[in-house]
Curated annotation (Swiss-Prot):
Gene3D superfamilies associated with the record: Plant lipid-transfer and hydrophobic proteins (1.10.110.10)
Signal peptide range: 1-24
Keyword Nucleus: no
Note: CM proteins would be involved in the cooking quality of pasta.
The protein's name in its UniProt record: Alpha-amylase/trypsin inhibitor CM16
Disulphide-bridged cysteine pairs: none
Post-translational modification: Five disulfide bonds, which are essential for the inhibitor activity, are probably present.
Similarity-based family: Belongs to the protease inhibitor I6 (cereal trypsin/alpha-amylase inhibitor) family.
Domain of life: Eukaryota
Record GO terms (molecular function): alpha-amylase inhibitor activity; serine-type endopeptidase inhibitor activity
Key words of the record: Alpha-amylase inhibitor, Disulfide bond, Protease inhibitor, Secreted, Serine protease inhibitor, Signal
Organism: Triticum aestivum (Wheat)
Length: 143
């Protein structure tokens, strides 16, 4: 039977390993990945238009969701929230966005939907926060 001090040391070693792994994941630089996006998340644009704007786009809503979630799943976990922010684009520069101002469907309505794409009711993908949620999705909170 292991002594109490050996158990404490083993527990400490396991915790240090976990914290080191989490720190390594959180420190991945998303900049090189983000710079390769020409049209950010093109399948998600169709899905957002279908769901937020009730605009019919080619293909079924189910297929649009699957393609959008697939695009998001291909993005490293720690970069997903940043990718969604990039997709939404700054309000001051709509030309740098994956979203378009549409008649009867302003970008704000679309942005509200984009904010929930990773949540359990939609793509259910973990993010940098190790949950299926992105924090600080308001433009004023972007760093």
């Amino acid at each position: 039977m292991a002594s109490k001090s050996n158990c404490v040391l083993l527990l400490a070693a396991v915790l240090v390993s976990i914290f080191a792994a989490v720190a390594a994941i959180g420190n991945e630089d998303c900049t090189p990945w983000m710079s390769t996006l020409i049209t950010p998340l093109p399948s998600c644009r169709d899905y957002v238009e279908q769901q937020a704007c009730r605009i019919e786009t080619p293909g079924s809503p189910y297929l649009a969701k699957q393609q959008c979630c697939g695009e998001l799943a291909n993005i490293p976990q720690q970069c997903r929230c940043q990718a969604l922010r990039y997709f939404m684009g700054p309000k001051s520069r709509p030309d740098q966005s994956g979203l378009m101002e549409l008649p009867g469907c302003p970008r704000e309505v679309q942005m509200d939907f984009v904010r929930i794409l990773v949540t359990p009711g939609y793509c259910n993908l973990t993010t940098v926060h190790n949950t299926p949620y992105c924090l600080a999705m308001e433009e004023s909170q972007w760093s």
